[in-house]
Amino acid sequence: VTRTVRVAPPNSLIFLCDEGGGVVPEFVANKLVLATSSAVSVGCLAEMDGETEITLGPTGDVDTRGLKVFDDVLETPTRRIVVETSEGEILLREDVSSNRVHVGIWVNRYVEPDKIVVGWKTL
C-alpha cells in the first residue's frame, strides 16, 4: 500500500526509521540526506515556504522517476517503518515482513525538495 501526506515539517526535516526508534545521524550542514544503519534524515522545503509531499510504499508501487538520493539497507527490528518529524510525530507508517529492508529515496530537486518518495523492499 502506498501512502502520501502533505506537511510542512518542523525544522524542514523528516526521518525514516524503525517504529521502535533508531540512531539519528548527526547534523551536517548542506547535506540533504544523512543516514545511520537505523535512521535516515531527509531535508525538505523550508517549512515557512509551504508543504512537502511525502510518499511511502513498496518500491514497485511508488514513482521512482525523481533524483535518487539514497539507496541502502535500513534496520527494522519491529518490522514497522515510519516517517516522522524531528519532534517525533509519525506522518506515515508501514508494516514490513523483515527486520532489514532495502530503501530508496527519490526527490524532485537537490535543494529544498517539496516532493520526497520513499520506496522499500524486504530483503
Segments and roles (model prediction):
Residues 87, 107-111:
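Generic hydrophobic/packing signal
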Residues 1-67, 111-123:
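Primarily secretory-pathway and cell-envelope proteins
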